[in-house]
Curated annotation (Swiss-Prot):
<dbReference type="Pfam" id="PF10257">
    <property type="entry name" value="RAI16-like"/>
</dbReference>
<dbReference type="InterPro" id="IPR019384">
    <property type="entry name" value="FHIP"/>
</dbReference>
<dbReference type="InterPro" id="IPR045669">
    <property type="entry name" value="FHIP_C"/>
</dbReference>
<dbReference type="Pfam" id="PF19314">
    <property type="entry name" value="DUF5917"/>
</dbReference>
<protein>
    <recommendedName>
        <fullName>FHF complex subunit HOOK interacting protein 2A</fullName>
    </recommendedName>
</protein>
<feature type="compositionally biased region" description="Polar residues">
    <location>
        <begin position="203"/>
        <end position="214"/>
    </location>
</feature>
<dbReference type="InterPro" id="IPR045668">
    <property type="entry name" value="FHIP_KELAA_motif"/>
</dbReference>
<comment type="function">
    <text>May be required for proper functioning of the nervous system.</text>
</comment>
<feature type="region of interest" description="Disordered">
    <location>
        <begin position="190"/>
        <end position="236"/>
    </location>
</feature>
<dbReference type="Pfam" id="PF19311">
    <property type="entry name" value="KELAA"/>
</dbReference>
<comment type="similarity">
    <text>Belongs to the FHIP family.</text>
</comment>
Amino acid sequence: MFSKLTSILQHAVEALAPSLPLQEDFVYHWKAITHYYIETSDDKAPVTDTNIPSHLEQMLDILVQEENERESGETGPCMEYLLHHKILETLYTLGKADCPPGMKQQVLVFYTKLLGRIRQPLLPHINVHRPVQKLIRLCGEVLATPTENEEIQFLCIVCAKLKQDPYLVNFFLENKSKSLVSRGALSVISEDGPKGQDPGSGDVSQCQQPQELSGATGVEPTESEEEPPHQMDDLSASLDDLNVTSLPEASAVRPNQDYNLVNSLLNLTRSPDGRIAVKACEGLMLLVSLPEPAAAKCLAQSTCLCELLTGRLTSLYKALPQSVDPLDIETVEAVNWGLDSYSHKEDASAFPGKRALISFLSWFDYCDQLIKEAQKTAAVALAKAIHERFFVGVMEPQLMQTSEMGILTSTALLHRIVRQVTSDVLLQEMVVFILGEQREPETLSEISRHPLRHRLIEHCDHISDEISIMTLRMFEHLLQKPNEHILYNLVLRNLEERNYTENKPSCPEDKDVVENGLIAGAVDLEEDPLFTDISPDNTLPNQEWICSPRTSPDHPKNDGKTEVHKVVNSFLCLVPDDAKSSYHVEGTGYDTYLRDAHRQFRDYCAICSRWEWPGAPKPLEKCDLEAAFFEGHFLKVLFDRMGRILDQPYDVNLQVTSVLSRLSLFPHPHTHEYLLDPYINLASGCRSLFSVIVRVVGDLMVRIQRIQDFTPKLLLVRKRLLGLEPEGPIVDHITLLEGVIVLEEFCKELAAIAFVKYHASATP
């Protein structure tokens, strides 16, 4: 009470007294602080019971006022005094000793406000950046301390200053070889790591030491400096009496270069206060984005950031229940790493493990965004660490297991993070993890060369329909990612030589016949008003190739519309009229696929535009047509499943045809020829998508004859699928009937894709 009254009286006296020049006023407030330590006999009283906070605030106000009154960039006498007399060094010492109690908090606030409110660059001064660096080491030493909030605010203002002037980061890459001791190693390797873990044990030993940054700072951060000014002798002696300078530091030797700003932030990411942890993550996000190569190298090699990311991913993944409903994994709300707040009591759609799932997806999102923002060197190092320690070390064993429930859950999680990833660097590591790096053509005897790829493709044809559907969905989303290696590894590498074709002249008259009969009831594209809906303004840039036969050197060149007319009708007329039901139901015509096909093709063209794909198929005379053709493991499984479309569940058929339609959308001449050209001369023993469908139709025509009332039953099933008819008694041959409906719709979709591609390439 008495100290508060004293403070009030002091403010009153200062207000009534004549104003002093700024420098005298500044020195007065500083000496008032130093005199406290010289004269005090009670070092147990909290700092809030003294006038120290008021004097520090007055000093800040004077520095700000001085800067506002002077020319931009000019250093005033008060700032000169602060720098010359090493006031920040002294405050650091007082804060480290926390004398009087609460002084550390006051020092952190002073540093934070000084860096935040003063516009001129302070960090290049050795008497600023060195005490700042020392104060950084004090942050995050102990979690859940009363100063945690001030610590994170101080660290974040330092990060913000480095973001403004990235070269300043070199002042914070400490050369530890000249130091005898430094603080102990961090314990942020994993969530379970004990505080103060021995630096020679566990994952800490994996933090490599980078080469020293010679001359990076321009200032040698030696410990020997000029003697402090004479007027500070009394204060120094008093501090000695208070044992401020005798506090021991840990004796563990750090690497040659240390990035303590990162280390302190890493510690604070483990704070039990979620707001502090998020702020620490934001600070790390700023640091990894700095363009300085030396800082990026030090961050990747001399800090435990990689261990933090992978360790927490691992622990959160392992905390998930052994089995989670795939639908829950797929539909859980979009997760943003900074908004990882979840209340089970307030959630009407809660399910077992939702809290753990959101935590895992939230942290994965943070890793993804961190790598996306990071400088290239740091981004690659972080992504490779996640690949090796999390994808291979944790996820792969789960994906390779034999338990159906385990396979389903782990595949659903893989599917979710494939959908979620946005960083190109992390996506590349994920693609290599799933598919491997192979780019040479596949052979049947070597399809298991990359075990995980082989296992996942095999799961597309698993005895469990749920596993098949989930794996197919994962591949479908993978194919939508902007990475050239995905399609090349799965499909293109096997089509490079076009050895699925036989180089022989074709007969023009053969084009008027489809393999299951004449083109009856063909759609006249030129008279259909729906084709004019895709205006020239909405088309893609002109391509050198189109998906109709006129692009192939094997076929005579006719009028383009005639050729695409025949291609479209080849697909539309594959399913015999007796097996068609869409024309009985309004709104299910072929035209319904045109808009979707146009939008999807435009999206794929945007993705693939930077991959420098050829504008036309490789000339046959340059192809090795004698080499044995193998469509590749992925297409083999898809074609096999397509061949069984009449005997598979409806949901499986939908997913198989969805993946095949995705493949047919890619603007590469070889995939178009192989998947969308009905007229290619297939080499002996080879099959294409069209030929697979033709075999299915042949089987269908035989089986139709054995089913009574086939057409009425087919129409009833279609209406039930569309919700136009209520569910009733089970219809005989329901699997076959649903397969026929999917087949008809798939042929219409392929016809629409073929036309949209022709239209896009033919429009000037």
